Regions:
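A short beta-loop-alpha structural element at the N-terminal edge
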Residues: 1-15, 142-156, 162-163
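Conserved donor-binding loop and adjoining core beta-sheet/short helix segment
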Residues: 25-82, 204-214
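A conserved beta-strand-loop-helix scaffold within acyl/acetyltransferase catalytic domains
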Residues: 49-56, 171-172, 179-214, 219
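Residue-level recognition of the GNAT/N-acetyltransferase active site
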Residues: 69-74, 103, 222, 226, ...
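Conserved acetyl-CoA-binding loop-helix of GNAT-fold acetyltransferases
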Residues: 75-88, 221, 227-240, 263-267
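Conserved hydrophobic beta-strand within the GNAT/NAT acetyltransferase core sheet
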Residues: 98-101, 216, 250-254
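Conserved active-site alpha-helix within GNAT-family acetyltransferase domains
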Residues: 104-122, 232, 257-274
Length: 283
């Protein structure tokens, strides 16, 4: 079977807009081109081609592509064709790397990606906490929300406090925080909420949150304060903040091999919701 491909500026995209808008919303404001792969009238997948710092897995300016499988109900042969053709398109566009995230249950997809030159980059869980009971928050820590002009102070502490992570994607992101254009920083800052966390006058943690979505993007604790309950209190602060924002649940991601963190999250009421794998192809 041969899939049909339409580009982002093709008039036919309007006919599939409803199926793809959740994926295109974050890229279209940046002018990132994309291609839609169709089987008949069904959207099988999407490919976006742009440059860092879209994902921060490589230095700013690095050309990249991101694949999204939209319809996992398609026959395996169709999904394999999409992934193979998406990689061909990416090579034609001269990207340095391509990557895709998919549910770990789809082992046949992992096998196919391995066969066309991809390697596993990350293996992680998404965990959920249902905010249906009152949240108690200890009062040992103080949380101060950051202003935009304080980003220069935030990134160095983020690197320091999140060092030693078992998350390969996070490690790459921390390496590539330099030279991000101010316009993109403005857009990013408008979507997130950052906090410095204090014990007395000392900064002992950082938080990167999306409160309206109930999403904990990053939580970092100073190495000298790990294992002392600081991280747990920071998480409880997040849960209370999200609950006050009207969120019904809180979500976070964690490396599947980080059993210590998973245990802490489960103790606080989180449960594993989804198991995801990230595969990457490099030129």
């Amino acid at each position: 079977m041969v899939l049909r491909v339409i580009a982002h500026d093709d008039a036919e995209v309007a006919s599939v807009r409803e199926s793809i808008s959740a994926y295109t919303a974050q890229y279209e404001p940046l002018g990132v081109p994309y291609w839609v792969f169709l089987s008949g009238k069904d959207v099988v997948g999407l490919v976006f081609v742009g440059r860092e710092p879209l994902q921060l897995l490589a230095p700013v300016g690095t050309p990249l592509s991101r694949f999204y499988v939209i319809d996992y109900e398609q026959p395996l042969s169709v999904l394999e064709e999409f992934l193979s053709e998406a990689l061909k398109l990416s090579k034609t566009e001269k990207v340095d790397y391509a990557y895709v995230i998919f549910p770990a249950e789809h082992t046949s997809i992992a096998n196919h990606l391995g066969g066309i030159g991809f390697n596993e980059l990350a293996n992680r869980y998404e965990m959920t906490h249902h905010l249906d009971t009152p949240i108690d928050q200890p009062g040992n820590l103080r949380f101060r929300r950051l202003a935009r002009e304080e980003l220069d102070q935030f990134f160095p502490l983020m690197k320091k406090f999140m060092s030693g992570s078992s998350d390969n994607v996070l490690d790459l992101v921390l390496q590539n925080l330099e030279n991000i254009p101010e316009q993109l920083l403005d857009m990013w800052f408008a979507q997130i909420t950052l906090f410095f966390v204090y014990l007395g006058d000392e900064i002992v943690g950082v938080l990167d949150l999306r409160p309206q979505a109930g999403w904990i993007s990053n939580i970092g604790v100073a190495p000298s304060h790990r294992g002392k309950g600081v991280g747990s209190e920071m998480l409880q602060f997040c849960l209370k903040l999200f609950q006050d924002e009207g969120c019904k649940e809180a979500k976070l991601g964690v490396s599947a091999v980080n059993t210590r963190a998973i245990h802490v999250y489960e103790k606080l009421g989180f449960s594993i919701d989804e198991h995801l794998q990230t595969f990457i192809w490099r030129k």
